[in-house]
A protein has these predicted regions:
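Ligand-binding face of N-terminal immunoglobulin V-set domains in extracellular IgSF glycoproteins
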Residues: 1-52
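Aromatic- and glycine-enriched glycan-recognition loops and surfaces
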Residues: 23-26, 108-119, 145-165, 172, ...
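Well-ordered alpha-helical scaffold segments within catalytic/enzyme domains
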Residues: 38, 125-147, 164-168, 200-216, ...
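An acidic-aromatic substrate-binding cleft motif
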Residues: 41-119, 123
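Long, well-ordered core segments of solenoidal/helical folds
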Residues: 52-74, 155-174, 223-240, 258-283
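Carbohydrate-binding/catalytic loop surfaces
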Residues: 82-111, 175-192, 241-256
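Solvent-exposed loop and edge beta-strand segments that line ligand/cofactor-binding
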Residues: 107-120, 186-198, 235-247, 272-284
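A conserved hydrophobic secondary-structure block that centers on an alpha-helix together
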Residues: 149, 153, 173, 181-237
């Protein structure tokens, strides 16, 4: 062991006999494993300085979506001590119509009860897809999930798994999108369709279809068609004064227009941009 850096802490805050200080060694960047030692306080935990210090944390954060997969067996080969048998494989009943049941398995659990909802999932998926678009070089095909090694970035494989659940939540006849799957004491309810969920669905599926077309054009087109059907159903039942729905509608129209170039979606973009209130990021 050898001393590689010496310095003195600077007082940040002082209240009575208590002092809060910090040490700044930002100008020291040599890779390695170190600890800090100070009189009275002793040694700190060891820490690393490296250009790749966050790599393992980033990989594990991305893999949390795999651990949260619903409706499939997670083997120990990929899940380790988080392995479990397939869950929530039974039918869910439609809230308000107990005689109607449907398969709502799949996707990602969003809480400890295994519940799932379209808008919450859309927010998560959109952040992941935006990150992938901006920094594609950071996403590999070797993150340790069953799809690893298929020549498709694993983050897109993971999002595709979630889109499979999205497609289950869309009514094949009307294009309506059920809002989610909520647990109760005897099973789970499928929540009724609503415009907000449909616009969120449309935005997410269009964006994924756009990104995925170079890997699987047929599935990408399936997603894009589903987005178009959801949007068209949503505009029939949206509430005129619902601000959040307007934001989702704008985002959905933008993504469908980007992916498919359909001129009919321009009017929704122009309408929103002409409204004067361009607040978006804080609501999405």
């Amino acid at each position: 062991e050898q001393i590689v850096y010496q310095g003195y802490p600077e007082i940040r805050k002082e209240e009575g006999e208590e002092k809060e200080a910090y040490g700044d060694f930002s100008d020291f960047a040599a890779p390695g494993t170190y600890y800090i030692e100070a009189p009275i306080l002793g040694k700190s935990y060891s820490f690393s300085i490296s250009d790749t210090v966050y790599d393992s944390l980033f990989q594990e954060a991305c893999k949390q979506y795999y651990y949260n997969r619903c409706g499939m067996t997670l083997g120990s080969e990929y899940a380790g001590d988080k392995a479990h048998n397939a869950c929530h494989t039974g039918k869910s009943v439609l809230r308000g119509s107990d005689s109607v049941s449907m398969d709502a398995s799949g996707g990602w659990h969003q809480n400890e009860n295994g519940e799932k909802n379209i808008t919450g999932a859309s927010r998560a998926m959109t952040v992941l897809m935006m990150s992938y678009e901006l920094y594609p070089q950071e996403y590999t095909d070797q993150e340790g999930i069953p799809e690893s090694g298929n020549q498709i970035p694993d983050i897109l494989d993971e999002i595709r798994y979630e889109t499979g659940w999205f497609l289950k939540m869309q009514d094949k006849q009307t294009g309506a999108v059920y809002a989610g799957d909520t647990a109760y004491d005897k099973g789970s309810y499928v929540e009724p369709a609503c415009a907000g969920a449909e616009f969120a669905f449309a935005m997410t599926m269009a964006k994924f279809g756009y990104l995925y077309q170079s890997y699987d054009k047929e599935y990408a087109m399936t997603c894009l068609k589903a987005a178009d059907r959801a949007f068209k159903h949503a505009v029939l039942c949206e509430e005129a004064d619902d601000r959040e729905e307007k934001i989702w509608r704008f985002a959905a129209a933008a993504e469908i227009y980007r992916a498919a170039g359909q001129v009919s979606y321009q009017k929704y973009l122009v309408e929103y941009l002409s409204d004067g209130d361009l607040t978006l990021a804080g609501d999405m």
